[in-house]
Amino acid sequence: MLEINYDTKLLGVVGENISYTLSPAIHNYSFQELGINAVYLAFDIKSDEFKEIFPGLVKIAYGLNITIPYKEIAIKYVEAQSEAKRIGAINTIFNGKGYNTDYIAIKSLVQERIDKFETCTIFGAGGAARAAIFALHDLDCSINVINRSKEKAEKLIEEMRNKNIEIKITYNCKSDIIVNSTPNPDFVPDECVNGKLVIDFVYKPVITSLIKRAQNKNIKTINGIEILVRQAMEAEKIWFGKSLEDEEVVNYLYARKLIW
Protein backbone atom coordinates (compact mmCIF):
# COMPACT_ATOMS: atom_id res chain seq x y z
CA MET A 1 0.00 0.00 0.00
CA LEU A 2 1.43 3.37 -1.05
CA GLU A 3 2.22 5.78 1.75
CA ILE A 4 1.92 9.31 0.39
CA ASN A 5 4.41 11.77 1.84
CA TYR A 6 6.24 14.99 1.03
CA ASP A 7 8.40 13.27 -1.59
CA THR A 8 5.59 11.45 -3.42
CA LYS A 9 5.56 12.37 -7.11
CA LEU A 10 2.25 13.14 -8.82
CA LEU A 11 1.54 11.70 -12.27
CA GLY A 12 -1.65 11.08 -14.21
CA VAL A 13 -3.59 10.76 -17.43
CA VAL A 14 -5.49 13.70 -18.91
CA GLY A 15 -8.57 13.15 -21.04
CA GLU A 16 -12.34 13.59 -21.20
CA ASN A 17 -14.87 10.94 -20.15
CA ILE A 18 -12.09 8.53 -19.17
CA SER A 19 -13.74 6.51 -16.41
CA TYR A 20 -12.79 3.42 -18.46
CA THR A 21 -9.04 4.08 -18.34
CA LEU A 22 -6.69 1.34 -17.14
CA SER A 23 -3.73 3.72 -16.84
CA PRO A 24 -3.96 4.31 -13.05
CA ALA A 25 -4.11 0.55 -12.39
CA ILE A 26 -1.15 -0.09 -14.70
CA HIS A 27 1.13 2.65 -13.41
CA ASN A 28 0.33 2.43 -9.69
CA TYR A 29 1.04 -1.31 -9.79
CA SER A 30 4.28 -0.69 -11.66
CA PHE A 31 5.41 2.08 -9.29
CA GLN A 32 4.76 -0.18 -6.31
CA GLU A 33 6.69 -3.09 -7.79
CA LEU A 34 9.60 -0.85 -8.83
CA GLY A 35 9.73 0.90 -5.44
CA ILE A 36 8.96 4.31 -6.95
CA ASN A 37 7.42 6.85 -4.56
CA ALA A 38 4.72 8.13 -6.90
CA VAL A 39 0.96 8.13 -7.35
CA TYR A 40 -0.90 8.11 -10.67
CA LEU A 41 -4.40 9.60 -11.06
CA ALA A 42 -6.95 10.17 -13.80
CA PHE A 43 -7.69 13.82 -14.59
CA ASP A 44 -11.06 13.96 -16.37
CA ILE A 45 -11.23 17.45 -17.84
CA LYS A 46 -14.15 18.89 -19.82
CA SER A 47 -13.18 20.42 -23.14
CA ASP A 48 -14.39 23.90 -22.16
CA GLU A 49 -12.14 23.80 -19.07
CA PHE A 50 -9.02 22.37 -20.70
CA LYS A 51 -7.23 25.64 -21.48
CA GLU A 52 -7.74 26.84 -17.91
CA ILE A 53 -6.73 23.64 -16.08
CA PHE A 54 -4.13 21.92 -18.27
CA PRO A 55 -1.22 24.43 -18.04
CA GLY A 56 -1.33 24.18 -14.24
CA LEU A 57 -1.27 20.39 -14.37
CA VAL A 58 1.79 20.45 -16.61
CA LYS A 59 3.57 22.59 -14.02
CA ILE A 60 2.69 20.62 -10.88
CA ALA A 61 2.75 17.04 -12.20
CA TYR A 62 6.01 15.10 -12.37
CA GLY A 63 4.77 13.44 -15.55
CA LEU A 64 1.57 13.11 -17.56
CA ASN A 65 -0.09 10.94 -20.16
CA ILE A 66 -2.53 12.47 -22.63
CA THR A 67 -5.45 10.61 -24.14
CA ILE A 68 -8.56 11.34 -26.21
CA PRO A 69 -9.45 14.04 -27.15
CA TYR A 70 -6.38 16.09 -26.18
CA LYS A 71 -3.39 14.43 -27.88
CA GLU A 72 -3.21 17.09 -30.58
CA ILE A 73 -4.11 20.23 -28.63
CA ALA A 74 -1.75 19.35 -25.75
CA ILE A 75 1.26 19.61 -28.05
CA LYS A 76 0.85 23.41 -28.01
CA TYR A 77 1.77 23.52 -24.31
CA VAL A 78 5.07 21.62 -24.46
CA GLU A 79 8.26 21.26 -26.47
CA ALA A 80 7.45 18.35 -28.77
CA GLN A 81 10.25 15.84 -29.31
CA SER A 82 11.25 14.01 -32.53
CA GLU A 83 8.42 11.66 -33.53
CA ALA A 84 5.79 13.58 -31.55
CA LYS A 85 6.64 16.76 -33.46
CA ARG A 86 6.29 14.99 -36.81
CA ILE A 87 3.08 13.23 -35.83
CA GLY A 88 1.55 16.38 -34.40
CA ALA A 89 0.29 14.58 -31.30
CA ILE A 90 1.67 13.65 -27.88
CA ASN A 91 0.65 11.13 -25.25
CA THR A 92 3.45 11.61 -22.69
CA ILE A 93 4.88 14.70 -20.95
CA PHE A 94 8.02 15.03 -18.85
CA ASN A 95 9.97 18.16 -17.91
CA GLY A 96 7.92 20.30 -20.27
CA LYS A 97 8.66 18.03 -23.23
CA GLY A 98 6.11 16.02 -25.21
CA TYR A 99 6.60 12.48 -26.52
CA ASN A 100 4.56 9.94 -28.46
CA THR A 101 4.99 6.47 -26.98
CA ASP A 102 2.09 5.13 -29.07
CA TYR A 103 4.49 5.43 -32.01
CA ILE A 104 7.29 3.70 -30.09
CA ALA A 105 4.94 0.91 -28.98
CA ILE A 106 3.59 0.08 -32.42
CA LYS A 107 6.97 0.26 -34.12
CA SER A 108 8.71 -1.96 -31.56
CA LEU A 109 5.89 -4.54 -31.38
CA VAL A 110 5.79 -4.91 -35.18
CA GLN A 111 9.57 -5.35 -35.32
CA GLU A 112 9.37 -8.04 -32.63
CA ARG A 113 6.57 -9.93 -34.36
CA ILE A 114 7.65 -10.08 -38.03
CA ASP A 115 10.80 -9.13 -39.89
CA LYS A 116 9.79 -8.94 -43.57
CA PHE A 117 6.86 -6.88 -44.82
CA GLU A 118 6.15 -4.37 -47.58
CA THR A 119 2.46 -3.45 -47.51
CA CYS A 120 -0.04 -2.40 -44.87
CA THR A 121 -3.78 -1.71 -44.90
CA ILE A 122 -5.22 0.42 -42.09
CA PHE A 123 -8.94 0.37 -41.36
CA GLY A 124 -10.05 3.76 -40.06
CA ALA A 125 -8.77 7.29 -40.54
CA GLY A 126 -9.16 8.74 -37.04
CA GLY A 127 -6.68 9.63 -34.33
CA ALA A 128 -5.71 6.04 -33.57
CA ALA A 129 -4.51 5.60 -37.16
CA ARG A 130 -1.93 8.41 -36.88
CA ALA A 131 0.74 6.71 -34.79
CA ALA A 132 0.34 3.50 -36.81
CA ILE A 133 0.83 5.36 -40.08
CA PHE A 134 4.04 7.04 -38.92
CA ALA A 135 5.43 3.90 -37.29
CA LEU A 136 4.77 1.70 -40.32
CA HIS A 137 5.98 4.37 -42.74
CA ASP A 138 9.25 4.57 -40.82
CA LEU A 139 9.53 0.79 -41.22
CA ASP A 140 9.36 1.31 -45.02
CA CYS A 141 5.83 -0.05 -45.33
CA SER A 142 3.56 1.07 -48.19
CA ILE A 143 0.28 2.19 -46.59
CA ASN A 144 -3.32 1.94 -47.79
CA VAL A 145 -6.39 3.18 -45.91
CA ILE A 146 -9.95 1.86 -45.88
CA ASN A 147 -12.54 4.11 -44.21
CA ARG A 148 -16.33 4.45 -44.31
CA SER A 149 -16.06 8.21 -44.81
CA LYS A 150 -14.18 8.95 -48.03
CA GLU A 151 -14.03 12.63 -47.05
CA LYS A 152 -12.26 11.82 -43.78
CA ALA A 153 -9.84 9.48 -45.54
CA GLU A 154 -9.01 12.13 -48.14
CA LYS A 155 -8.40 14.67 -45.38
CA LEU A 156 -5.96 12.24 -43.72
CA ILE A 157 -4.20 11.63 -47.04
CA GLU A 158 -3.74 15.36 -47.60
CA GLU A 159 -2.45 15.83 -44.06
CA MET A 160 0.07 13.00 -44.48
CA ARG A 161 1.16 14.32 -47.87
CA ASN A 162 2.09 17.58 -46.16
CA LYS A 163 4.37 15.48 -43.93
CA ASN A 164 5.90 13.69 -46.94
CA ILE A 165 4.03 10.44 -46.31
CA GLU A 166 2.12 8.94 -49.24
CA ILE A 167 -0.93 6.84 -48.39
CA LYS A 168 -3.72 5.65 -50.67
CA ILE A 169 -7.43 4.97 -50.35
CA THR A 170 -8.01 1.37 -51.37
CA TYR A 171 -10.63 -1.35 -51.53
CA ASN A 172 -8.02 -4.06 -52.05
CA CYS A 173 -7.07 -5.21 -48.57
CA LYS A 174 -4.46 -7.82 -49.49
CA SER A 175 -1.45 -6.73 -47.40
CA ASP A 176 1.34 -8.06 -45.22
CA ILE A 177 -0.06 -6.12 -42.24
CA ILE A 178 -3.72 -5.42 -41.44
CA VAL A 179 -4.52 -2.78 -38.80
CA ASN A 180 -7.90 -2.06 -37.21
CA SER A 181 -7.80 1.45 -35.74
CA THR A 182 -11.60 1.67 -35.40
CA PRO A 183 -13.62 0.77 -32.26
CA ASN A 184 -15.26 -2.11 -34.19
CA PRO A 185 -13.19 -5.26 -34.90
CA ASP A 186 -15.94 -6.52 -37.22
CA PHE A 187 -15.34 -3.56 -39.54
CA VAL A 188 -12.56 -5.71 -41.02
CA PRO A 189 -14.26 -8.28 -43.30
CA ASP A 190 -13.13 -11.92 -43.34
CA GLU A 191 -11.54 -11.64 -46.79
CA CYS A 192 -9.25 -8.93 -45.40
CA VAL A 193 -7.96 -11.08 -42.54
CA ASN A 194 -4.85 -12.13 -44.39
CA GLY A 195 -1.12 -11.52 -44.66
CA LYS A 196 1.52 -11.94 -41.97
CA LEU A 197 0.27 -9.78 -39.09
CA VAL A 198 -3.06 -8.45 -37.81
CA ILE A 199 -3.16 -5.54 -35.32
CA ASP A 200 -6.29 -4.54 -33.39
CA PHE A 201 -6.30 -1.45 -31.15
CA VAL A 202 -9.41 -2.65 -29.28
CA TYR A 203 -8.51 -4.20 -25.90
CA LYS A 204 -11.85 -5.13 -24.33
CA PRO A 205 -12.06 -8.03 -24.84
CA VAL A 206 -8.36 -8.73 -25.37
CA ILE A 207 -9.11 -11.48 -27.89
CA THR A 208 -11.48 -9.58 -30.17
CA SER A 209 -13.39 -11.19 -33.01
CA LEU A 210 -10.68 -9.89 -35.36
CA ILE A 211 -7.81 -11.31 -33.31
CA LYS A 212 -9.67 -14.63 -33.06
CA ARG A 213 -10.21 -14.79 -36.84
CA ALA A 214 -6.52 -14.08 -37.43
CA GLN A 215 -5.44 -16.75 -34.95
CA ASN A 216 -7.75 -19.27 -36.64
CA LYS A 217 -5.83 -18.60 -39.86
CA ASN A 218 -2.44 -18.91 -38.09
CA ILE A 219 -1.69 -15.23 -38.66
CA LYS A 220 0.45 -13.46 -36.07
CA THR A 221 -1.33 -10.80 -34.02
CA ILE A 222 -0.82 -7.72 -31.84
CA ASN A 223 -3.77 -7.02 -29.57
CA GLY A 224 -4.87 -3.73 -28.03
CA ILE A 225 -3.67 -4.53 -24.52
CA GLU A 226 -0.16 -5.19 -25.84
CA ILE A 227 -0.14 -1.72 -27.39
CA LEU A 228 -1.60 -0.09 -24.26
CA VAL A 229 0.88 -1.73 -21.88
CA ARG A 230 3.90 -1.17 -24.15
CA GLN A 231 3.19 2.55 -24.56
CA ALA A 232 2.70 2.80 -20.78
CA MET A 233 6.03 1.12 -20.04
CA GLU A 234 7.78 3.31 -22.61
CA ALA A 235 6.34 6.35 -20.79
CA GLU A 236 7.77 5.06 -17.49
CA LYS A 237 11.20 4.77 -19.10
CA ILE A 238 10.93 8.46 -19.99
CA TRP A 239 9.83 9.44 -16.46
CA PHE A 240 12.04 7.16 -14.38
CA GLY A 241 14.47 5.37 -16.71
CA LYS A 242 12.99 1.96 -15.90
CA SER A 243 9.80 -0.10 -16.17
CA LEU A 244 8.36 -3.54 -15.56
CA GLU A 245 8.24 -6.22 -18.24
CA ASP A 246 5.05 -5.98 -20.32
CA GLU A 247 4.05 -9.56 -19.50
CA GLU A 248 4.09 -8.89 -15.75
CA VAL A 249 1.70 -5.96 -16.15
CA VAL A 250 -0.65 -7.91 -18.43
CA ASN A 251 -0.73 -10.80 -15.93
CA TYR A 252 -1.61 -8.33 -13.15
CA LEU A 253 -4.50 -6.90 -15.19
CA TYR A 254 -5.86 -10.40 -15.81
CA ALA A 255 -5.48 -11.30 -12.12
CA ARG A 256 -7.41 -8.18 -11.11
CA LYS A 257 -10.05 -9.04 -13.74
CA LEU A 258 -9.54 -5.61 -15.31
CA ILE A 259 -9.20 -7.29 -18.71
CA TRP A 260 -10.64 -10.50 -20.06
Curated annotation (Swiss-Prot):
NADP(+) binds at residues 124-128. Keywords: Amino-acid biosynthesis, Aromatic amino acid biosynthesis, NADP, Oxidoreductase. Its EC number is 1.1.1.25. InterPro entries: Aminoacid_DH-like_N_sf, NAD(P)-bd_dom_sf, Shikimate_DH-bd_N, Shikimate_DH_fam, Shikm_DH/Glu-tRNA_Rdtase. It comes from the Archaea. SUPFAM superfamilies: Aminoacid dehydrogenase-like, N-terminal domain, NAD(P)-binding Rossmann-fold domains. The active site is at residue 71. It catalyses: shikimate + NADP(+) = 3-dehydroshikimate + NADPH + H(+). The keyword Aminoacyl-tRNA synthetase does not apply. The keyword Ribosomal protein does not apply. One of its GO terms (biological process) is chorismate biosynthetic process. It holds the Pfam family Shikimate_dh_N. Belongs to the shikimate dehydrogenase family. PANTHER family: BIFUNCTIONAL 3-DEHYDROQUINATE DEHYDRATASE_SHIKIMATE DEHYDROGENASE, CHLOROPLASTIC (PTHR21089:SF1), SHIKIMATE DEHYDROGENASE (PTHR21089). This is Shikimate dehydrogenase. The gene is aroE.
